[in-house]
């Protein structure tokens, strides 16, 4: 695990020191005081508390308000939390247990039962089409849309809404009478079934031989001044697009976007000749086994391009994955290694290519 930053340590020390004074406050005021503390140390994060004034222990929720780039920081803050007798520390706003609720904004009220949702595929994510089940005055259209986003965050939970949901479009009367619409108040079980049954994200690691599919793609295609791709007859030989071959592990779709497989790790190696290519393929395949057997990660695709072979893995922990792969990366064929790691909970690096297979 990553060592907590000094800022995280300073925040938790300040919070621990303030526990006695915090406990003397009503819960609403306690939340405000706690946020004043976190604001001093950790930009972009906030604290929420779930419980009642009389509860001896309440949930202390660390949130990034849906900002994915701050999700790793949320996880680090929660992992570094000390023992707190009055708090259960949690990462991200969880789904509400009461999804049928109204909210008001500037004199306008809207209930989740009045927000209708249809689900569609958006790459590996779920796209949402939203319409309202009653007439919304023209002056409140923007309010209603903003309220719907707030509701979605509460109904689906902060992490799922930020990571699993793709495009969100507001529509008028439905064009297709057969499209199933569900009230937002009833969305969670419908969304979960769509996620596992329609999109195939069961969350279970594949067993046995993985299934692979391949395609040839062109990169750096020349375009005209309007951004349109040039026809082959209009391309000079020196401007010809670069060809690459991608092999996609379609079995990996089952664990796509699992919260514990959020880091994209790329092992990028030069393959100047056929012997080196064979050795690199063997190394990257062995790396896949080293990661997948303990379910530390999974190989999702390979890309041959410009004399290099890239293998993309999604892993649960950057440092543990690097430690597990370290002996393999000492081999001669790894001398040209470029090792890259990025936080990518939506698996965009995978669906950038897997999306072509279902297009």
Where are these regions (language model features)?
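Charge-rich, low-complexity segments
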Residues: 1-59, 65-69, 80-286, 292-306, ...
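"Short basic amphipathic alpha-helical interaction patches in structured regions
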Residues: 74-79
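Short beta-strand->loop micro-motif that forms the acidic, two-metal-ion catalytic signature
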Residues: 309-313
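An aromatic-glycine-centered, glycine-rich loop/turn in mixed alpha/beta architecture
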Residues: 324-327, 331-334
């Amino acid at each position: 695990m990553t060592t907590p930053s000094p800022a995280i340590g300073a925040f938790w020390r300040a919070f621990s020191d303030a526990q006695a004074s915090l406990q003397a406050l009503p819960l609403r005021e306690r939340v405000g005081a706690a946020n004043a503390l976190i604001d001093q140390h950790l930009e972009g994060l906030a604290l929420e508390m779930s419980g009642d004034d009389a509860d001896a222990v309440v949930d202390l929720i660390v949130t990034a308000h849906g900002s994915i780039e701050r999700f790793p920081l949320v996880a680090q803050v929660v992992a570094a939390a000390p023992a707190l007798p009055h708090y259960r520390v949690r990462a991200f706003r969880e789904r509400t247990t009461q999804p049928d609720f109204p909210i008001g904004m500037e004199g306008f009220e809207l209930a989740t039962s009045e927000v209708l949702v249809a689900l569609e595929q958006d790459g590996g994510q779920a796209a949402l089409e939203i319409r309202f089940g009653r007439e919304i005055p023209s002056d409140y259209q923007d309010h209603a849309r903003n309220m719907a986003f707030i509701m979605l965050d509460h109904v689906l939970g902060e992490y799922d809404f930020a990571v699993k949901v793709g495009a969100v479009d507001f529509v008028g009367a439905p064009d297709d009478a057969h499209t199933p619409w569900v009230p937002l108040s009833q969305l969670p079980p419908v969304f979960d079934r769509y996620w596992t049954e329609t999109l195939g994200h069961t969350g279970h690691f594949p067993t046995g031989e993985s299934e692979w599919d391949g395609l040839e793609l062109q990169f750096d295609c020349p375009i005209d001044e309007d951004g349109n791709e040039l026809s082959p007859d209009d391309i000079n030989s020196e401007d010809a697009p670069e060809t690459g071959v991608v092999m996609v592990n379609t079995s990996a779709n089952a664990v796509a976007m699992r919260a514990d497989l959020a880091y994209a790790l790329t092992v990028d190696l030069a393959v100047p000749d056929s012997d080196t290519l064979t050795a690199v393929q063997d190394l990257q395949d062995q790396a896949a086994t080293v990661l997948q057997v303990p379910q530390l990660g999974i190989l999702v695709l390979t890309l041959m391009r410009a004399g290099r072979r890239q293998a993309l893995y999604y892993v649960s922990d950057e440092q543990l994955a690097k430690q597990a792969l370290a002996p393999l990366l000492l081999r001669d064929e790894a001398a040209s290694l470029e090792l890259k790691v990025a936080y990518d909970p939506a698996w965009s690096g995978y669906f950038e290519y897997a999306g072509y297979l279902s297009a």
